Amino acid sequence: MDENGASFQVLCLATIGFHHLRGPEIEHLFPESMDFPKEWSILPFLSLPDGAHSSEKDFVYFTLPFPNDEGTVFGLSCTRQLNASSLKNIPSDVTRSSVQKAVVVITTSPPFGHIKDNLDIVTNAYFSQGDFSNLDVLRDFFHVLTRKEQDVHIALNINLKSFLCEWRQNALVLLKVLLLGKRILVYDKSAERLGNFQYSLLSLIPCMMSHLQDVSSPSAHSLEKSLHKPASLQTSDKRSLLAYTGFPLIIFGEGSMFSPYTPLQLVHVLEAKSSTSWLAGTTNTLIMLNQNKMAEVIVRSDTHQIEFVDPTIKNLTSLTYTDKSWMEDIISRVESSLEMELPGFEGSDDWIRNQFELYIFGMLATVKYYNFLKKQDDSILSQYHYLPSTSCISDYGETFLLEWMKTNTFRIWNNIADDDLFDVILPKHPCKEEHKVPISARIATLFSAVKITPKSRDGEDEGSKEPAV
């Protein structure tokens, strides 16, 4: 599975309508012979979000448990409303001036790119008919999505440049909060903006977007059970290096969940004692009024504000001087390249991901190095001909690193990542990189020219102790 995209399967297509007495309900389902899973009974409430009547069009991202399995499916709903007078045949149960419906796609991976674009087009065509009983356009769309010969890959298609320019240095604060496994509630009147914000944040973490199979339920932890410490490292293989470094990081393991849109009907899951960590989004003001009882951090993606319900988290995730300098440099480079759309170009979305990849790689190497130093006596350390600088610890923030080492994410990662990781990847904040070296050269060094060298002590092999990165 590729980091810039994930192969996927379309499981079903549905239409959701809003009945003035019964509320949101499923009207049509493709394939029509599908045995609808009981685990998806919440689908109508996910597809037509709270406040949907206040906008003509919106997109909703949501997650559901995979039927009879430890896994997750991903939903994308395109909501529209139409003036009832525009209908050719007004159904007897339509008693309001407007009709509100959604067309929904359920897939095995987050649906972005052309799936979203095509869903928008098809939904518009379905509404433009003025006859909701004519399902031909939906039936044809489903057949196109499920053609066996179609090899579908979904590009992330997330605008990280906008995300970074809007959130600026707080983008790194939010990443630190996420890494610490806190309970994060995101609010926005726009469900589309709500989902885009959360997926943008997740996409900053290497391998995250292709390893979201456990996010729909706090009880799911199949990914953790499948991980193991690699027996070897192939320096020319990026996947091998990622595995050696301990990826994927289990941000949403047992006790955690990711719910990009959360209706009132799911609030009890967030409030449960078993839900110790989550990232959840809402458009409902009632949930916001009650947020202090369950969330530790409140994010307003519409106004770009962060509220720390627990003030200690603000201190733990505050940026170091080195963090701030690094973010200033990245933002400057992004803003100077806003008109450039070439993939991989300095300031592009791929380039931004590479920067945060280097940041997290350096952080993980720093944690291993920190623990190595703590285990050794000064008399032993003095025998080494070379050891990396310890400035990396303060550059990332010692209190932040210590707090991260209390998380479930750290526990799982520490068991599978090699203890000598800092021999391969230099424990160094990316702000300390030599800016004269092009990013392409640094990435090439990281993934193509890694060489493992033993720590050299007196009387032992004195191979170069300088890590490759």
Curated annotation (Swiss-Prot):
Residues 163-332 form the cDENN domain. The keyword rRNA processing does not apply. Residues 334-437 form the dDENN domain. One of its GO terms (cellular component) is cytoplasm. Keywords: Cytoplasm. It comes from Schizosaccharomyces pombe (strain 972 / ATCC 24843) (Fission yeast). It comes from the Eukaryota. GO terms for biological process: post-Golgi vesicle-mediated transport. InterPro entries: ABL9/DENND6_dom, DENND11/AVL9_GEFs, Tripartite_DENN. Pfam families: Avl9. This is Late secretory pathway protein avl9. Residues 11-150 form the uDENN domain. Functions in the late secretory pathway. Required for the generation of secretory vesicles as well as for actin polarization and polarized growth. It is found in: Cytoplasm. The keyword Cytoplasm applies. PANTHER family: LATE SECRETORY PATHWAY PROTEIN AVL9 HOMOLOG, LATE SECRETORY PATHWAY PROTEIN AVL9-RELATED. Belongs to the AVL9 family.
